[in-house]
Regions:
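Basic/aromatic-rich interaction segments and small domains that mediate binding to polyanionic partners
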Residues: 2-75
Length: 75
């Protein structure tokens, strides 16, 4: 079970509100292969600190804080 501290959860929700664009650096998922460099849009951050993201051309998949890597795209 993954989880983050309340402080980390608040920071993630502030930094990645719905609509934030992100670029995938690394996704640790043996079942879904989304290439590094793929761009997506954050839908929401859940209570475990996972960023639920709609990936351009790859459907939806959550990223796990502390496991997966991404960067925010400045607009």
């Amino acid at each position: 079970m993954f989880g983050v501290s309340r402080q980390t959860l608040e920071r993630l929700r502030k930094e990645y509100p719905s609509g934030t664009r992100v670029e995938l650096i690394r996704l640790d998922d043996p079942y879904r292969k989304i290439p590094s460099g793929t761009i997506g849009t954050v839908e929401f951050v859940d209570d475990a600190g996972q960023l639920h993201t709609v990936w351009d051309g790859h459907g939806s998949l959550a990223m796990i804080c502390g496991v997966d890597e991404w960067r925010k795209i400045q607009s």
